């Protein structure tokens, strides 16, 4: 069959060739656009903050635009960071002054009795934030927990206090031996320790606080 002086098969072949050429051009344009976006992305984001070179799991930006949705890492809530324990200087004032932060003593019952310091914190992996991912977080209390529970110690003191079990558990070994040898000071020492425990006068010897039961 002839259409306009050209066989139909010839026209169909030309149409298929034109369609194939168009697909090749489209794929070429898409690949060029993708490579251009991949090159431009590290330079500037839509939020107006520059990507640094680093691992993908610890993405961070340099803080520049205050209207950007990306906040400083130091402003992240506690659930998005992990912090080290406060540095224990064991009363060494010189070490405290050289480092600039840390705890000279731990423990305390009232807020005014507890020292507060800065601790080293870092943003969790996968959290995107601006500025260095490691920073100092302010106003952390100088308290630690070493497995001592008030209720357990009180029960030890009430039922086994005459044998010094309560003071052994709290680490007061010397006075615990004396309490054991005197059978709780004939009951007087046993009663005094009960009062001291209830009022907060008898605490763990390592300066730790009572563990909280939730």
UniProtKB/Swiss-Prot annotation:
Keyword Membrane: yes
Extracellular face residues: 36-144, 204-214
Topology relative to the membrane: Multi-pass membrane protein
Membrane-traversing stretches: 145-165, 183-203
InterPro entries (UniProt xref): TM2 (IPR007829), TM2D1-3-like (IPR050932)
Domain TM2: 147-195
Cytoplasmic compartment residues: 166-182
The organism's taxonomic lineage, starting at the top: Eukaryota, Metazoa, Chordata, Craniata, Vertebrata
Subcellular location: Membrane
Keywords: Glycoprotein, Membrane, Signal, Transmembrane, Transmembrane helix
Matching PANTHER family: BETA-AMYLOID BINDING PROTEIN-RELATED, TM2 DOMAIN-CONTAINING PROTEIN 2
Organism: Bos taurus
Similarity section: Belongs to the TM2 family.
Pfam families from the UniProt entry: TM2
A Gene Ontology term for the protein's cellular component: membrane
Keyword Cell inner membrane annotated: no
Gene behind the chain: TM2D2
Identification of the protein by name: TM2 domain-containing protein 2
Glycan attachment positions: 37, 92
Signal sequence range: 1-35
């Amino acid at each position: 069959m002839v259409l306009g002086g050209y066989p139909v098969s010839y026209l169909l072949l030309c149409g298929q060739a034109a369609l194939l050429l168009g697909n090749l051009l489209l794929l070429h344009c898409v690949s060029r656009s993708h490579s251009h976006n991949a090159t431009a992305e590290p330079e500037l984001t839509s939020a107006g903050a520059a990507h640094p070179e680093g691992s993908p799991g610890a993405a961070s930006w340099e803080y520049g635009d205050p209207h950007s949705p990306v906040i400083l890492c130091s402003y992240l809530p506690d659930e998005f960071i992990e912090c080290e324990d406060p540095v224990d200087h064991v009363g060494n004032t010189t070490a405290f002054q050289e480092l600039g932060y840390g705890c000279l003593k731990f423990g305390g019952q009232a807020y005014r009795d507890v020292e507060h310091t800065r601790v080293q914190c870092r943003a969790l992996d996968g959290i995107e934030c601006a500025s260095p991912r490691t920073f100092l977080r302010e106003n952390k209390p100088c308290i630690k927990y070493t497995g001592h529970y008030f209720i357990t110690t009180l029960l030890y003191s009430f039922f086994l206090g005459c044998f010094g079990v309560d003071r052994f558990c709290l680490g007061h070994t010397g006075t615990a031996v004396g309490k054991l040898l005197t059978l709780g000071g004939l009951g007087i020492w046993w009663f005094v320790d009960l009062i001291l425990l209830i009022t907060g006068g008898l605490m763990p010897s390592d300066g730790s606080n009572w563990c909280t039961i939730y």
